[in-house]
Every structure is written in structure tokens, then in C-alpha cells.
Amino acid sequence: VINAALFLDDVTEFNGPTMFVPGTHKLGMIPSDKNFDRIPEYGRLAEDAIGSPYTNETIDRLIKEHGLAAPKGPAGSVVFFHGCTLHGSAPNMSPWNRTIVFWSPNRTDNKITAPTRPDFLALQDFEAVEPLTDDCLTS
């Protein structure tokens, strides 16, 4: 799985950029340190819709081994990253928006089997994208 993050607003060090632990995709699936109860109506994590399945100790160790990066850029920028790259964001405490659209193109036979977030955070629609005709915008 590859992910694309499209910045709809400028992303700066002040408005909570997504942080990445570079190279962690090479580790494959990192086993979670915690088990969360699910909220039935959302199928999400009970403690926090965007909570981490990893302890602070695990995250600290991985950052010490691999470093930490927080891509920033103007609206319209796109960041591509492997789905197994450890990533997350702090809350945006600034007065400036930080709207980012995440897109995860993937084969339909490789879909997520246990969604962890409500649709308003991560839409779980696994229908195949249907191609349009070449003249779809002019006809």
C-alpha cells in the first residue's frame, strides 16, 4: 500500500504536520503493544479515534533508531509514503488550518480487514475505482 497526503493548506512546523519515522516500512508490520476495545457504532479505538497502538517506549526506540521527519510545504504539495511507515500527527494548536487529504490506492483484494476509525476520519469504501472515458470532462 502506498499513501498520498495532499496538503489543502500550507503545512508548517506550527500547525501539526504529520510526522514520519523514516525507514520503518522496511520492518514490515510492527506488532502493536496495546489492544483497544472498539466502540461498536464506529468500529474505532475506544480510547482515542486516532490513538497509537504503540507504547511511548516503542515509539522512542524507533525514533532513536530511524530518526523523525515532518514534511512541510505549501498547499498543493503531495507526500507519498509506504503504508507501513510509522506516522502520526500532534493536534494543531495554531490558528492556521492544516487540512490534508490522505489517499491510499490499493488492490481491492488487499483491503483492511479490521477498520479502526470512523468513516469521518478514514472512509472504509473498498469498491474498485471505475475508469471514465477520455472525453469525460468535455462530454
List PLM regions with ranges.
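Short, surface-exposed, charge-dense and proline/glycine-enriched linear segments
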Residues: 1-5, 45-55, 120-129
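Short, flexible, glycine/charge-rich loop motifs used to bind or transfer phosphoryl groups or to couple energy/partner
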Residues: 9, 69, 91
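Non-heme Fe(II)/2-oxoglutarate
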Residues: 34-38, 75-80, 84-139
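Double-stranded beta-helix
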Residues: 14-86
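Short, conserved beta-strand element in jelly-roll/cupin
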Residues: 1-13, 48, 72-75, 80, ...
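A cross-taxa feature marking solvent-exposed loop/turn segments within ectodomains of secreted
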Residues: 13-14, 96
